[in-house]
Amino acid sequence: MVCESNNKSYLKSQNLKIIGKNSLRGNVKISGAKNSALVLLAASLLTDEKIILDNVPLLTDIEKMGNILKNLGVKLHNKDHQLIIDSKNISIQELPYELVNGLRASFFCIGALLTRFGKASLPLPGGCNIGERPINEHINGLRALGAEIIIEKEVVKAKLIKKKSKLFGANIRLNCPSVGATETLIMAASLAEGRTIIENAAREPEIQDLCQMLNKMGAKIYGAGKEKIIIDGVQKLHGCSHKVIPDRIEAGTFLIAAAATSSSITISPVIPNHLEAVLNKLEESGSKIEKKGNSISISGKSIKAVKIKTAPFPGFPTDLQAPFMALMTIAKGTSMISERIFENRMHHVNLLNQMGAAITVDDNTAIINGVKKLKGMNLVGSDLRSSAALIIAALISENISHIYGLEHLDRGYENFEFKLTKLGAKIIREVDGGIQTKSKNSSEIHPTKNLDINFNVA
């Protein structure tokens, strides 16, 4: 059983045609957080009662995760941005590789399935090609909880140790604050017997969102957002309603786009505390920031060079490293951006240089000498965030750019070009050299809302 989408596939021939040098102005509605929604979908497997999720973003990654759940026998019903999940009648089976390929979040299911049913079998996950993202921390942690795990032919097979009816609490110290491992172990420990303590845990807002939903379901989790998380296992979790937090990465991307184009926009809803590191660097680079309730306004001015090192939350997020580098290409002076999370996340450097940027890379540090202008090019984004960086670069470039590789963009940005166009950008999605959607006024450029997920089919 699979879901149906208005777009059956994302053709590599699709591209965004972008006319640069247009300022942005207005308000942007920020979607629900992709990285939160994905793990919350996995967490729904922990109960046989219904979970109602609101503010779910319409993204291809959400579509893929929904297909994974449906393959397990989960019933899904969605309307707009609400998703009702019924995991009562699950059939535990090995998921086909083609279903999980390209979606690293699929591996989140292993902790939930293992702790609820005593076994799980998943192919090794995929995702963006941005370097090694090993699952050693996940596996070592699950073993500490009492799981027996083997890897055969790229498939991870987990089960309870013989004579044990469930997982048992343990003290676990992560070698690094892995977000995925922290989330996987929290889910597994929620139904384990006894207390689990995770030290050196990741502190990201998405983890806090997961723990908030699990506690609504009856879990006993303490310390979310801190380096030490305590989970007292319970016998059973029940259903709940939960609203996905706003996407801080999407929010940051729009703020960076406004700064790059010397524009004034307001984004909402957002949680400003989730964006402190980004806001600090935007202010340092010359933008004026105003926070009011659940909204942030930015006024871009002359751009100054800054130094950035990516770091786990509350540090500067690695997912905004590429977009911020696009901003720094036209900054006054020399900027330095060091990537400290992933060892191979500089694919966008060569692409930005083709547009006229002056960037060199030494190990995992990019040195950006600001230039006066960029030029429009035809380029292919290599991953989700590099695609966003190229779009920002195209917005500030002279002439016209065509950005390909939209299958990456649509994984993580809901109606990205539609939102930009409402702000005044000149963007249209083309397919095979033709316009996918036209406005009544041919002089205007309007993109398509490119994904309409429908899980309400057998």
Swiss-Prot record:
Q: Can you say where in the cell this protein is located?
A: Cytoplasm
Q: Which InterPro entries match?
A: Enolpyruvate_Tfrase_dom, Enolpyruvate_Tfrase_sf, MurA_subfamily, RNA3'P_cycl/enolpyr_Trfase_a/b, UDP_GlcNAc_COvinyl_MurA
Q: What is its EC number?
A: 2.5.1.7
Q: Which Pfam families match?
A: EPSP_synthase
Q: What class of enzyme is it?
A: transferase
Task: Provide one Gene Ontology cellular component.
Answer: cytoplasm
**Pathway stated in the Swiss-Prot or TrEMBL entry:** Cell wall biogenesis; peptidoglycan biosynthesis
Q: Extract one GO BP annotation from the record.
A: cell division
Q: Which reaction does this chain catalyze?
A: phosphoenolpyruvate + UDP-N-acetyl-alpha-D-glucosamine = UDP-N-acetyl-3-O-(1-carboxyvinyl)-alpha-D-glucosamine + phosphate
Q: Which domain of life is it from?
A: Bacteria
Sites binding UDP-N-acetyl-alpha-D-glucosamine sit at R104, D319, I341
Q: Which residues carry this modification: 2-(S-cysteinyl)pyruvic acid O-phosphothioketal?
A: C128
Q: Which family does it belong to?
A: Belongs to the EPSP synthase family. MurA subfamily.
Q: What does this protein do?
A: Cell wall formation. Adds enolpyruvyl to UDP-N-acetylglucosamine.
* Entry protein name: UDP-N-acetylglucosamine 1-carboxyvinyltransferase
Per the UniProt entry, what species is this protein from, by scientific name? Prochlorococcus marinus (strain MIT 9515)
Q: Please name the gene that encodes this protein.
A: murA
